[in-house]
């Protein structure tokens, strides 16, 4: 027995070399590799010293670094066991050390090699050593593959690398046995031994014979990978035709045969107690660490071994079982998608160029057709086409036009008609009709296209790739036609995929550009609307400024040369305008000239038709349209090419027409221009409507001012009237009668203003108001009472007298402000009464009902009172402080509102409850307000407390006003209530009886309870009630006899 013992060598520094880069590396010869350290680094090498490499070879630098793999195919820790640098094709030379690892590369692309590692422990010590200066080679018979088979030693060993063998060449395992050899023991791991029997030494040592082959030529990684395994390439796989010298193969064939038999037995019979042939092989020469997973991995890398074995040794029944088991798996498992074509650097460059073009056009706002042409040029380069043609849809979308880019002298691109969209003509027409991509290898031999491409150079074209250009919403906008000339390779599926992907991306990108442009336009439009709004509110009356602003932006919105705006006169059925675009600019803005207004019939011209129909007209060629009036161009010398005419609609009616003339950039106004203009026209309609409405308001305001001036003249008293009142003195005989509740002011009409002045002075003092202002105020109030049957000036003075009588009999209960406010409130409580009830005004939507939803007339009375107080020389409360002024106005307001009979019922009920429970407190302001409200109702109804003849005459006046309202309701087809129906005048006594019992008697009863001095009002009301009962019974007396208390007071007053 021979033994081998060698020391561990230090690890060299520097990166690993590539396959074939170092000298002396090739088939049949060990390639120097970096040594492994004791922890797993370093390498194993063949006999002789190996140089330290300063860097990797070209192929190694070209390929990305890959981590070492574990025995299960997973990456191992850097520098750990299993680190591999073996490369080559077919079988490879492997440097063997203890422990050893075998690695095999699969037939997969060179960009992603896979290796399999064996990592056995060291064998037990053998009885003998090999000579220290020798190394043995283990030829292992493995089928030739494109990937390399390598074995590497780790821990105490290194990795191995070798070129591929050719044909059926065996892959020898080389075990260096001398410390002078590169690839000796690793550093830091002590000394290790490898023991082999003499029989094995005799079997293995003959493999050292024969010279080593020269190294393969240096090639780039990709080229080397393609040439590996090809005929004539040194180190090729099976049948490669390499020049590798053959070695003695007796031992190799014997071992390979034994391995195949044992391995086949395991595959056929399944797992057994005996190890597989491959495991036995490793147990004999390497270690017992081989597993079933490693065998499976090896077979996946070398499927031809399994193919040979299955075809020779496995029965058909067993194969059928395998197929059934395979088919039972889920059909949803899909193979990984091939994405390599989308990782091509050529396509990445195309995408970068497309991005660049899109960004440029997005910034400059270039035309989409020119942009598509430039993108098509990039796709031409990507597909290596000899040329291309770009088609766009013609008018009505039923024909194609070939796009010709602008030349040096030409300023604009051109669209040349190429023919209709139909099958049986050209390739482009066929694709436009079907909207499907078409690849034609020989266009001249295809009977579907008798006209071929339709291009002038069509005779030289052989292969054609034609693709539709479709927008994101599915609309066809063009056709891209790529072609190659005769003698060139035809387009293939990969070219179609590249062109389709890039064109689809370009379509989406252009759509995004259009969206961005739309957003930019929308932002610009929003800014304009804000600007117009600012202009409108800053100078709302200047409608000409607004129209000019609208026309300026309308031109910029659609990029038009001229603009005109006509307003519609529906009354005369005419269009008119006095603001015109003269084509000049000042400080970068168009100049509009205001001239004499021109008018023309709505039946003439394009603008007239738009005004009549309300439809948008987009005319690409004005002279081809019979509706266009050429006389305008002849008169002005201006040439009209195209027109976009838009109606301005407000409330379903056309109020104006905006006409854009001549698109500056482009052949005609586009659909996008129409859509933007429609949105703009909506705001124009709003702005014009508001401007016209404000104009009408201003006109109405002027009329209102003139009317108010007239009214003020007739509603304000003259100086003679108020000066005469200042000189008035009440007769002495009336001074006593005024103090009575039943005093009738009827016979003293000329004295009514003087009577009120007297009552104010008696109740509030002579210095409470300035006499001049008081006289002005009273006489103006008199003028503002209308001549209606009941709610007139007489009624106002009568109510004021009743309040004066109550205040005089309860003088200490009320403050000076309250007395002033209540007397003025009674005088003004029916100011400007129209003779109609609140229900009538609300039912027929009177303007007063729109102003005041509740207590309509009462709120109007208070408003009129304040208006008179605000007149010059009429503010009788001017001497009061600010707080007192507010208090007295609030007293007047509450008092006047309380005269609404609808509020009376709730107010009286609350007061009755408070009186019965003893909770009424006149020091409480809310209670006080309720009492004042009840006093105002009692004064308003005081006609029922007068002497019977006065009461009866007043009732006639009341019913005259009611019947007048009923007559108006009948005119409108509405049946009035009986109280207002003139035809039911016989029911008046019954109505009065109900009114007394429901309203008057309860009112005066509660008032008497709260203010006992007002009892004469209750007694007089009851006397009149008895008179109405007599009328109903037909017992009315010719002469009215009052109750003793009232008669006595009347006699006393006469004395």
Curated annotation (Swiss-Prot):
Requisite cofactors: a divalent metal cation
Binding residues for a divalent metal cation 1: 795, 829-830, 940
Residues annotated to bind 3',5'-cyclic AMP: 562-563, 606-607, 640, 659, 791, 992
Keyword Hydrolase annotated: yes
Enzymatic reactions: a nucleoside 3',5'-cyclic phosphate + H2O = a nucleoside 5'-phosphate + H(+); 3',5'-cyclic AMP + H2O = AMP + H(+); 3',5'-cyclic GMP + H2O = GMP + H(+)
Domain of life: Eukaryota
Residue ranges annotated for the GAF domain, each copy included: 367-510, 542-688
Tissues expressing the protein: Abundant in the putamen and caudate nucleus regions of brain and testis, moderately expressed in the thyroid gland, pituitary gland, thalamus and cerebellum.
PROSITE patterns xrefs: PDEASE_I_1, PDEASE_I_2
Active site, renumbered: 791 (proton donor)
Residues engaged in binding 3',5'-cyclic GMP: 791, 992
GO CC, alphabetical: cytosol; glutamatergic synapse
Biological process annotations from GO: cAMP catabolic process; cAMP-mediated signaling; cGMP catabolic process; negative regulation of cGMP-mediated signaling; regulation of adenylate cyclase-activating G protein-coupled receptor signaling pathway; regulation of cAMP/PKA signal transduction
KW Cell wall biogenesis/degradation (keyword) present: no
UniProt biased composition (Gly residues): 79-90, 154-168, 232-243
Alphabetical list of InterPro entries matching this protein: GAF, GAF-like_dom_sf, HD/PDEase_dom, PDEase, PDEase_catalytic_dom, PDEase_catalytic_dom_sf, PDEase_CS
Domain notes: The tandem GAF domains bind cAMP, and regulate enzyme activity. The binding of cAMP stimulates enzyme activity. Composed of a C-terminal catalytic domain containing two divalent metal sites and an N-terminal regulatory domain which contains one cyclic nucleotide-binding region.
Disease: Dyskinesia, limb and orofacial, infantile-onset: An autosomal recessive, early-onset hyperkinetic movement disorder characterized by axial hypotonia, dyskinesia of the limbs and trunk, orofacial dyskinesia, drooling, and dysarthria. The severity of the hyperkinesis is variable. Striatal degeneration, autosomal dominant 2: An autosomal dominant disorder characterized by striatal degeneration and dysfunction of basal ganglia, resulting in hyperkinesis.
Chain's role: Plays a role in signal transduction by regulating the intracellular concentration of cyclic nucleotides. Can hydrolyze both cAMP and cGMP, but has higher affinity for cAMP and is more efficient with cAMP as substrate. May play a critical role in regulating cAMP and cGMP levels in the striatum, a region of the brain that contributes to the control of movement and cognition.
Name by which UniProt lists this protein: cAMP and cAMP-inhibited cGMP 3',5'-cyclic phosphodiesterase 10A
Lineage of origin: Eukaryota, Metazoa, Chordata, Craniata, Vertebrata
């Amino acid at each position: 027995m021979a033994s081998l013992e060698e020391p561990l060598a230090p690890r060299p520094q520097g990166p690993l070399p590539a396959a074939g880069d170092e000298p002396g590396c090739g088939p049949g010869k060990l390639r120097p590799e970096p040594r492994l350290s004791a922890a797993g680094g370093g390498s194993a090498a063949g006999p002789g010293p190996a140089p330290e490499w300063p860097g990797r070879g070209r192929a190694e630098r070209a390929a990305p670094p890959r981590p070492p793999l574990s025995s299960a195919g997973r990456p191992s820790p850097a520098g750990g066991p299993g680190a591999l640098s073996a490369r080559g094709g077919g079988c490879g030379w492997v440097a063997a050390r203890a422990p050893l690892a075998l690695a095999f590369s699969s037939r997969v692309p060179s960009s992603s090699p896979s290796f399999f590692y064996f990592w056995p422990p060291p064998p037990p010590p053998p009885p003998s050593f090999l000579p220290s200066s020798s190394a043995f080679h283990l030829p292992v018979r493995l089928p030739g593959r494109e990937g390399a088979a390598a074995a590497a030693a780790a821990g105490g060993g290194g990795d191995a690398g070798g070129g591929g063998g050719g044909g059926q060449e065996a892959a020898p395992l080389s075990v260096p046995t001398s410390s002078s050899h590169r690839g000796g023991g690793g550093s830091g791991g002590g000394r290790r031994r490898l023991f082999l029997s003499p029989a094995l030494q005799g079997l293995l040592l003959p493999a050292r014979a024969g010279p080593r082959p020269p190294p393969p030529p240096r090639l780039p990684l990709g080229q080397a990978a393609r040439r590996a395994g090809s005929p004539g390439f040194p180190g090729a796989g099976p049948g490669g035709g390499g020049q590798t010298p053959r070695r003695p193969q007796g031992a190799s064939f014997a071992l390979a045969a034994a391995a195949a038999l044992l391995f086949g037995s395991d595959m056929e019979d399944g797992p057994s107690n005996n190890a597989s042939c491959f495991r036995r092989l490793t147990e004999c020469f390497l270690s017992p660490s081989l597993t079933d997973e490693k065998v499976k991995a090896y077979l996946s890398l070398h499927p031809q071994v399994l193919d040979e074995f299955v075809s020779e040794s496995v029965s058909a029944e067993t194969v059928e079982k395998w197929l059934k088991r395979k088919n039972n798996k889920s059909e949803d498992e899909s193979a990984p998608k091939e994405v390599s074509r989308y990782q091509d650097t050529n396509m990445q460059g195309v995408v970068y160029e497309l991005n660049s073009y899109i960004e440029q056009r997005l910034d400059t706002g270039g035309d989409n057709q020119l942009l598509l042409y430039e993108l098509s040029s990039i796709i031409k380069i990507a597909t290596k086409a000899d040329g291309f043609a770009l088609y766009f849809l013609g008018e009505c979308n039923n024909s194609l036009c070939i796009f010709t880019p602008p030349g040096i002298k030409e300023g604009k691109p051109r669209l040349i008609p190429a023919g209709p969209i139909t099958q049986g003509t050209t390739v482009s027409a066929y694709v436009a009709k079907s909207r499907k991509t078409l690849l034609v290898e020989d266009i001249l031999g295809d009977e579907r296209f008798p006209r071929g491409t339709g291009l002038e150079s069509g005779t030289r074209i052989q292969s054609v790739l034609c693709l539709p250009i479709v927008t994101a919403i599915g609309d066809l906008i063009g056709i891209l036609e790529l072609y190659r000339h005769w003698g060139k390779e035809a387009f293939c599926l990969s070219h179609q995929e590249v062109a389709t992907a890039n064109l689809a991306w370009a379509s989406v990108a252009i759509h995004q550009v259009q969206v961005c442009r739309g957003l930019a336009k929308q932002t610009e439009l929003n800014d304009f609307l804000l600007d117009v709004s600012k202009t409108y509110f800053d100078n709302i009356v200047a409608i000409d400024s607004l129209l000019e602003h609208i026309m300026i932006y309308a031109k910029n919105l659609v990029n038009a040369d001229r603009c005109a705006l006509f307003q519609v006169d529906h009354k005369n059925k005419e269009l008119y305008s006095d603001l015109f675009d003269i084509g000049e600019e000042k400080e970068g803005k168009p100049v509009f000239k205001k001239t004499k207004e021109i008018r023309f019939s709505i039946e003439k011209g394009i603008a007239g038709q738009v005004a009549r129909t309300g439809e948008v007209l987009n005319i690409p060629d004005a002279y081809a349209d019979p509706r266009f009036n050429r006389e305008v161009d002849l008169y002005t010398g201006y040439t009209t090419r195209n027109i976009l005419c838009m109606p301005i609609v407000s409330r379903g009616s056309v109020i104006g027409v905006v006409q854009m003339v001549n698109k500056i950039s482009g052949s005609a106004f586009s659909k996008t221009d129409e859509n933007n203009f429609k949105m703009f026209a909506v705001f124009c309609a709003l702005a014009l409507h508001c401007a016209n409405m404000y104009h009408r308001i201003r006109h109405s305001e002027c009329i209102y001012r003139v009317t108010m001036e007239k009214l003020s003249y007739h509603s304000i008293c003259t100086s003679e009237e108020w000066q005469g009142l200042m000189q008035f003195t009440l007769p002495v005989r009336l001074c006593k009668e005024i103090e009575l509740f039943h005093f009738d002011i009827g016979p003293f009409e000329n004295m009514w203003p003087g009577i009120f002045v007297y009552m104010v002075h008696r109740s509030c003092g002579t210095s409470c108001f300035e006499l001049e202002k008081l006289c002005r105020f009273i006489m103006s109030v008199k003028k503002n009472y209308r001549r209606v049957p009941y709610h007139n000036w007489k009624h106002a003075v009568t109510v004021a007298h009743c309040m004066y009588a109550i205040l005089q009999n309860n003088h200490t209960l009320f403050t000076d402000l309250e007395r002033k406010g209540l007397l003025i409130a009674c005088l003004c409580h029916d100011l400007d009464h129209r003779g109609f009830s609140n229900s009538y005004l609300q039912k027929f939507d009177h303007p007063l009902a729109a102003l005041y939803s509740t207590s309509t007339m009462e709120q109007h009375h208070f408003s009129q009172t304040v208006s008179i107080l605000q007149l010059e020389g009429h503010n009788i409360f001017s001497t009061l402080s600010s707080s007192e002024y507010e208090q007295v106005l609030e007293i007047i307001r509450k008092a006047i509102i309380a005269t609404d009979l609808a509020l009376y019922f709730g107010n009286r009920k609350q007061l009755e409850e408070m009186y019965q429970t003893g909770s009424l407190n006149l020091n409480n302001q809310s209670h006080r307000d309720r009492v004042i409200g009840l006093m105002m109702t009692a004064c308003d109804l005081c006609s029922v407390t007068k002497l019977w003849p006065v009461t009866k005459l007043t009732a006639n006046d009341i019913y005259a006003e009611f019947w007048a309202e009923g007559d108006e309701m009948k005119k409108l087809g509405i049946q009035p209530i009986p109280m207002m129906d003139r035809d039911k005048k016989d029911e008046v006594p019954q109505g009065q009886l109900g009114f007394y019992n429901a309203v008057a008697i309860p009112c005066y009863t509660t008032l008497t309870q709260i203010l006992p001095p007002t009892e004469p009002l209750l007694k007089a009301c009851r006397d009149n009630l008895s008179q109405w009962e007599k009328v109903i019974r037909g017992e009315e007396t010719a002469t009215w006899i009052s109750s003793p208390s009232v008669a006595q007071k009347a006699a006393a007053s006469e004395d």
